[in-house]
Amino acid sequence: MAKEFLIELGTEELPPTQLRTLAEAFAANFEAELKGAELAHEGVKWFAAPRRLALKVAALADSQSDKVVEKRGPAVSAAFDAEGNPTKAAQGWARGCGITVDQAERMVTDKGEWLLFKQEVKGQPTSQIVVELAAKALANLPIAKPMRWGNKTTQFIRPVKTLTMLMGSDLIEGEILGVASDRTIRGHRFMGEQEFTIDSAEQYPAILEERGKVMADYEARKAIILADAQKAAAAVGGIADLEDDLVEEVTSLVEWPVVLTAKFEEEFLKVPSEALVYTMKGDQKYFPVYSHENGDENKKLLPNFIFVSNIESKEPRYVIEGNEKVVRPRLADAEFFFNTDRKRPLIDRLPELEQAIFQKQLGTIKDKTDRITELAGYIAEQIGADVEKSKRAGLLAKCDLMTSMVFEFTDTQGVMGMHYARHDGEAEEVAVALNEQYMPRFAGDELPSNGVSTAVAMADKLDTIVGIFGIGQAPKGSDPFALRRASLGVLRIIVEYGYNLDLVDLVAKAKSLFGDRLTNDNVEQDVIEFMLGRFRAWYQDEGFSVDIIQAVLARRPTKPADFDQRVKAVSHFRELEAAESLAAANKRVGNILAKFDGELAADIDLALLQEDAEKALAESVEVMTEALEPAFATGNYQEALSKLADLREPVDAFFDNVMVMADDEALKKNRLTLLNNLRNLFLQIADISLLQK
């Protein structure tokens, strides 16, 4: 008989940024354990709150099904000797099965006859195995730093206080993480019943909400926060900034979400909104309120914020006033730092960068600034941006690191540089570049908006990549300098803006600016290989298959925009009817040429062409070579591959009718030359022999 199953683990406060991950992993792990144990069920739903992880399994079978286990033994021909006596192999197999050889059955297949043992295995009751399954699911959670507590030897992400396991209304007895299962559920610390018993799995989570004032359904809590926050913002004429990561964190911090609106003095709005938002979101987990949506030029920060309380107070005004008192000193600090910092122009802080170390072997932030300045000017020249403005932006790029605001609110680096540069009267492109130098900050982030910003952003990232590789600290598992993200940022900028830039030139220029600081003689090669490797993850995320990416990577094109054109062309080619046949032919040609140990002529000898099929292919290759020159010259690889698809018929005919490895050496070499020329046409774009069916 199928019943609902509940397991709830009551803990001390779980890390809010990990709560969803833990709950989803618990559900996935437990479902995998149920599948492995062959326990029928109709789905697993997870619940998570700050002090609990729980699962409910719908219609969980009360026992495993009975089954017949078959164990095949040796072939009959090997199981008996010439006199018909069991061999040692047969006897050993039979002993392992707990039978004698003459008790074994026979299994006949098209490959012969085998000894067979069949055993009926009774299914175990769910109550006897589910505790072990749950323990395994919890043991395999992604916990980086488990902890011990009290005098226990068990480890978990936080101390475990309660354990409840119910199968319908039956208590499943057992112990996990040193805690015995019982019917006790803990409620909210300050509301409802702090402790009560639960009679059946079906009561969960409703009983916890009704009696314990804890909303265990994570998604329901999140939905309430989103809906009520937007309503609260609309009530003050604004729109709430409900960044998903912050919403997730707040959802993980509260058991009973109560959304409230507070305000602060309008005089603080004279401070750049980024600094105010940083302290509201980062320090206090508040949601700022804006006048308009993102992207609207009229968007302004309003003197309100929304927060989520974990208690339903009879006097919410006191809760609101308390939060206003907490945030006010932080906003006052931001105001003070802003006013103080503006008393000195950014450029005056440049010498102070000598006191800040970028990396011991690579020098100070001032050294990095000098390199960025030079490299930004070089890149600006290549992409047609203003060279002098790019150099000026490079010079000022890191100066805001020496301001009080950025020292106190580190996430405002860049954006505060922009505001201070505007105050100093710097050109707008220069000021904007100080903020956009860090773009793109993450996958899918916006790119720098102008040429000056682009030059500085690329220069900063390339300097870091080349420098760290240059001292032999390429990322392996961890990536403390975020070189993967920096590499992808450079590639995205080049590809999406279509710049005709070559990584070989960029890396060489960046390397030259380090003087004798670098110790890795292969730094240029290493950096280019690393950056090209980032393409694999990027294009996979874009939906391109691995074999398409590998086909292009095999040619190692070092111009990112050119790489992009090749990937898209090969993807288009793969959908053509001729693609599979030509990919197979290219693979065959590659294998044939790999086995030939010798030199081939650059051109075929027309006089040695004998078969009609090889003459036709030779003519097609010659015509195609000339026809494709304009497409190759302009990088129109899609057009080139579409034309190359026309070679399917003469290629198929060649392999059907021509013996490549002829006895006549001259004839064989001529045919190999023809195939080599054919393959080289495709290799000018990609190695399509790597395409899979």
UniProtKB/Swiss-Prot annotation:
GO terms for cellular component: cytosol. GO terms for molecular function: arginine-tRNA ligase activity; ATP binding; glycine-tRNA ligase activity. Tetramer of two alpha and two beta subunits. It catalyses: tRNA(Gly) + glycine + ATP = glycyl-tRNA(Gly) + AMP + diphosphate. It is an enzyme of class 6 (ligase). Its main location: cytoplasm. PROSITE patterns: AA_TRNA_LIGASE_II_GLYAB. Keywords: Aminoacyl-tRNA synthetase, ATP-binding, Cytoplasm, Ligase, Nucleotide-binding, Protein biosynthesis. Belongs to the class-II aminoacyl-tRNA synthetase family. This is Glycine--tRNA ligase beta subunit. InterPro entries: DALR_anticod-bd (IPR008909), Gly-tRNA-synth_bsu (IPR015944), Gly-tRNA-synth_heterodimer (IPR006194). It comes from Vibrio campbellii (strain ATCC BAA-1116). Its EC number is 6.1.1.14. GO terms for biological process: arginyl-tRNA aminoacylation; glycyl-tRNA aminoacylation. It is found in: Cytoplasm.
